[in-house]
Amino acid sequence: VGSGRELQAPGVPLDAEQTIAWLRGLIAVFGLALLGSTNGLWWPVGDFPVVPWIDFGGPLALDHALAWALVLSWLGVLAATVLQMPSLIRASSIISILSLTGCILLDQHRLQVWAWEFLWLQVFLTFGQPQAALLSSRLLVVGIYFYSAVSKLDAGFVQTQGPWLWQGLSRAMGLASIPWGAKASSLYLAFPLGELLVAGALVLRRSRRWGIGLSVGMHIILLLALGPWGWQQRPGVLLWNLFF
């Protein structure tokens, strides 16, 4: 593969183009992996209710066709990136946006967090100017962290989800037998407060590197809590956390 300068637009810093190329590639790779790990949602066989946003009355073959179009378009993005074919990258990206939108419209269950995120990231990267696309993508990620944190700042999280996450992390780290007592509630709140800290750090240029580091650390903790040494969640949950 060449240096990537062939794909650089006039007046656009090379690092912005490289970042966008990396993002496109990661979306395609993780998108394919997530489709595979949740394949029952995307290639239904009639044993699970389909709840369309707009009822076209179409056959399940339409769902299958759109899902395969999504697979092929993401493969096209990867191939075109390696071969340095900007026009094919753009065409494949547009097809993936349309296919993913169609899949979601045909079944509300497909509006997974990762699918929603990937859809908007692709829109920004495909139709925005490089710098604006990266800024929009960053703000989307910050918004997800912020919303996730705020939604956890209530009694429900402290009483249910917080203890559940902490138990998974304790299992993974071999600390399940330790009695935490009254300190436990403050430990549970570390999850949303950590997300708020990451969101704030990612907004400011000076603290962005720290924000990225904190984000990586936070997702390692979540992978421990949710992974095979913790609560043994499904691959789709772990893959999305790994991407994020």
Description of each model-found segment:
Residues 2-244:
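Alpha-helical membrane-anchoring segments
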